[in-house]
């Protein structure tokens, strides 16, 4: 939204403000190709309803910190909107869908608060992972502890152990959380709409071996089914930009 303090009848000033905010994203070829397409190659609602798997790599090393944050926020809001659109489906017919968000503090917005408090009835389940509670704002932290049914914690640092102690008290204290051995955790889960007493659990160490060959084959298959040739995308975007730049500028509004 154009800031009230900068409102102007001059269309040129509005355009300049917009370009200054979006310029860093649109000047990045990868981001321009992602955001500049007129139609997405996949439908979030269809993915949720048909129990498909969508993997989104938002590595800062590949996309850049600012770009990763923007894309992460966009996807979170799209999943929220898709979940809310399930209002047109009978509650018993809604399929459970799990949204796993690693390092979610990078994408935490008010959408998370809304999802935590409202999206449960639309069968959107969140699995949120991060390293330190201090990475979260007080508002997000309170929303999590107040709405999440299952909380699982491995070994924590001193500060986080003190923050999380109340979730597992009086069975476990901060010292227990700080002294957890490897591949162990303390958890409390929701059963029959009631939280269980906190308990300890053993976690499985990494199992099996990854297959780079299989991974590459899956990437090729997914790209061929849902993607488009980069050259076609860039050609369409450049054509639209050229068409826009050739049009005369809108006259300034009279004051």
Q: How should each PLM-predicted stretch be described?
A:
Residues 22-29, 78-87, 123, 140, ...:
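Conserved NTP-handling cores and scaffolds of large molecular machines
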Residues 10-13, 17, 53, 70, ...:
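Conserved P-loop NTPase motor module
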Residues 58, 156, 203:
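Active-site donor-binding loop signature of nucleotide-sugar glycosyltransferases
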Residues 43, 57-59, 132, 173, ...:
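Short, solvent-exposed coil/turn linker segments
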Residues 1-124, 140, 177-181, 187-195, ...:
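P-loop NTPase motor domains
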Residues 115-197:
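Conserved ATP-driven motor cores of ASCE-family P-loop NTPases powering translocation/secretion/packaging/pilus
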């Amino acid at each position: 939204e154009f800031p009230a303090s900068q409102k102007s009848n001059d269309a040129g000033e509005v355009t300049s403000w917009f370009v200054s905010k979006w310029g860093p994203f649109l000047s990045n070829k990868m981001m321009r190709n992602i955001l500049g397409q007129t139609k997405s190659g996949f439908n979030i609602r269809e993915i949720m309803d048909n129990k498909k798997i969508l993997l989104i790599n938002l590595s800062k090393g590949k996309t850049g910190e600012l770009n990763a944050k923007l894309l992460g926020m966009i996807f979170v809001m799209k999943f929220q909107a898709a979940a809310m659109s399930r209002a047109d489906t009978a509650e018993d017919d809604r399929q459970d869908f799990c949204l796993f968000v690693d390092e979610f503090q990078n994408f935490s917005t008010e959408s998370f608060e809304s999802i935590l408090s409202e999206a449960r009835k639309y069968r959107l389940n969140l699995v949120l992972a991060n390293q330190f509670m201090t990475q979260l704002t007080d508002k997000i932290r309170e929303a999590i502890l107040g709405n999440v049914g299952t909380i699982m914690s491995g070994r924590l640092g001193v500060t986080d152990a003190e923050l999380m102690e109340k979730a597992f008290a009086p069975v476990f204290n901060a010292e227990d959380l700080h002294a957890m051995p490897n591949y162990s955790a303390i958890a409390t889960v929701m059963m029959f709409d009631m939280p269980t007493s906190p308990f300890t659990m053993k976690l499985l160490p990494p199992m099996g071996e990854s297959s780079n060959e299989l991974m590459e084959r899956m990437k090729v298959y997914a790209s061929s089914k849902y993607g488009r040739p980069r050259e076609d995308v860039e050609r369409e975007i450049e054509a639209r930009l050229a068409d826009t730049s050739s049009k005369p500028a809108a006259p300034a509004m009279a004051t």
